[in-house]
Amino acid sequence: RTLKEITSIKTGQAVNKQMISANPGEYPVINSGREPLGFIDEWNTDNDPIGITSRGAGVGSVTWQPGKYFRGNLNYSVTIKNPKLVSTRFLYHLLLELQPEIQALCTYDGIPALNASNLKDLLIPIPCPDNPQKSLEIQAEIARILDAFTELTAELTAELTARKKQYNYYRDQLLSFEEGDVEWKTLGDVCDFKNGFAFKSNLFKDTGLPIVRITNINGSGVDMADVKYFDPSDYKENTQSYAIDSGDILIAMSGATTGKIGCFNSNRTAYLNQRVGKFIPKSNALNNRYLYHFLLSKTDAIYVLAGGGAQPNLSSKALMEKILIPIPYANDSTKSTAEQKRIANILDKLDTLTNSITEGLPREIELRQKQYEHYRDQIG
């Protein structure tokens, strides 16, 4: 059946941020995004939770807002005409599955928009349409399964957030030292820094030796899913001096990932692109993993050092001169390296639990999300 056969589609009421600021209250305002635009002192919708964004960057997004709320003029209500034929929660999950089809109905000339007349012709599959009772039972079971996966994913995500906070707390505690037990040194005192090579984009290959670019630095590791390659014979320079090995600590020097740290964990050698830097401890007096965790704690300060703003750009000179690292028991090298190793080992365990794609919670969340999408695909 078409969406217009089973639902009524209407536009909400005009609203803006000034109106919300002037009339603060408890009712969420759902307008051009999945999250509330704000909270206001009046509502115009009750127990009509499904909506679809009609204009703006989030056009075509399916929204769910239970209870009383204010629906804005950039959100279509999708109200079921006969609840004895179609379950609200089933329809919500189905519309999520049909998101690509909804996006295809949108226009993107100027301000992105979704015309209600186009949306109304969207085809909606209803199980066992000739047996309403059986149909509702099937819909209810499908919605129950998908809701269970949604809830589990939310719980895992909350757990992951808590673990990250735990890691940050212990990291900050472990990197705090009593006066006299620590000597603060510049990164330049204890590290060398290697800038990347200007590989030419017109010489990128589909195979060959991998290049690590700033977009590969993800804030803890190096994501090699989207990698460009090169052939050394295309360059007269000695590209071997830009090699990266497993365990090397990298930093993005410009762009959207400026200041993000990544530890390269691959058995295959890769190569530094321009605006990617590599930290090289000057001696065994500095534990590499200790350095890694310290740098993670300084990403905000490093970003500020880069100037922030729309086009942050980090200077290696400023980085190595202005960021100070605490060296415990600096006058006793044996005691210092032992303490650095102890701290790094504790943080490595927490880091693995929090971030590892094979051992930690992100992998569990990914699996549950795939299960959810698999079951949701069955209703499309």
Regions found by a protein language model. Give the residues of each.
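A short glycine-rich beta-alpha junction/loop motif
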Residues: 69-75, 110-129, 270-277, 310-331
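Short, structured motif recognition centered on aromatic/hydrophobic residues
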Residues: 3-7, 27, 75, 88, ...
